[in-house]
Every structure is written in structure tokens, then in C-alpha cells.
């Protein structure tokens, strides 16, 4: 029951965060007339654009816009994003941590570390 409440609360908070940064994120991930292609946003995220990184995290968390829901990848992108933009990305990390096991968080942190160590080239 508690997990269900946290999950519902997480979705509400995430929705608020996404609306708050929606224009900035869409502008960052839009290469051609607000394209929602995952490859466009991924390319920007790998170039270090924190808005695109947050967008990748949100896409993986919600399983929308061309990706399957994957909280580990969502956490990885939020962690990478938090290196440059702690506010919103840090809140995203807090939301994800409420829904993830310690093992999943450890895996996601390791993936983020490898991604950052490769200058954002090996982010899978």
C-alpha cells in the first residue's frame, strides 16, 4: 500500500516537474520542428545538454516517446543531468529512489559513472 502511495505521489510530482521545464526541454530536444525522435534527444543529451538529459530520464521513467519504461536508465540520465543542473534533476533522482531497490540504484549509479567516464559516449 505504501509503495502504491509513493508511486502515485511520484507521478504527480514528476508531472509537475515535467510541466515546469517542458518548454525548455522540448526546445532542447527539438532538432526539426519539435521532433520527438529519441535519437535527436539522445544526441543532445550525449553532447552534455542537461535539459535533454532530464528529458531522457523522464522518457525512461514514463516509457514514452520511443522508449520502454526503465527506471535504471531513468536514474542514470537523472544522475548525469544532476552534475550540471542539480535542482530539477536532483528532484527526479529523489522520485526515482522512492520507486527503486538499492540494487537497482547501485546499478544505475555504476552506469552513470561509466557514462560520465566515457565523456557521455557509452551511455546505455
Give the role of each language-model region.
Residues 41, 46-50, 60-64, 78, ...:
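Short helix-capping/linker turns of helical repeat alpha-solenoids
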Residues 34, 91-124:
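Terminal, low-structured helical/coil segments at or just beyond the last alpha-helical repeat
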Residues 31-39, 68-76, 107:
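Structural signature of tandem alpha-helical TPR/SEL1-like repeats
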Residues 15-24:
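C-terminal segment of classical bacterial N-terminal signal peptides
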Residues 31-32, 46, 61-69, 83, ...:
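Short coil/turn and helix-start
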Residues 52, 67, 89-91:
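TPR alpha-solenoid repeat register
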Amino acid at each position: 500500500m505504501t509503495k502504491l502511495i509513493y508511486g502515485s505521489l511520484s507521478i504527480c510530482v514528476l508531472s509537475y516537474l515535467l510541466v515546469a521545464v517542458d518548454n525548455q526541454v522540448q526546445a532542447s530536444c527539438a532538432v526539426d520542428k519539435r521532433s520527438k525522435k529519441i535519437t535527436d534527444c539522445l544526441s543532445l543529451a550525449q553532447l552534455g545538454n542537461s535539459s535533454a538529459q532530464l528529458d531522457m530520464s523522464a522518457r525512461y521513467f514514463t516509457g514514452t516517446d520511443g522508449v520502454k519504461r526503465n527506471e535504471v536508465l531513468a536514474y542514470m540520465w537523472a544522475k548525469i543531468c544532476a552534475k550540471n543542473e542539480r535542482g530539477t534533476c536532483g528532484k527526479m533522482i529523489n522520485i526515482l529512489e522512492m520507486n527503486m531497490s538499492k540494487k537497482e540504484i547501485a546499478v544505475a549509479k555504476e552506469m552513470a559513472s561509466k557514462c560520465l567516464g566515457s565523456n557521455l559516449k557509452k551511455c546505455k
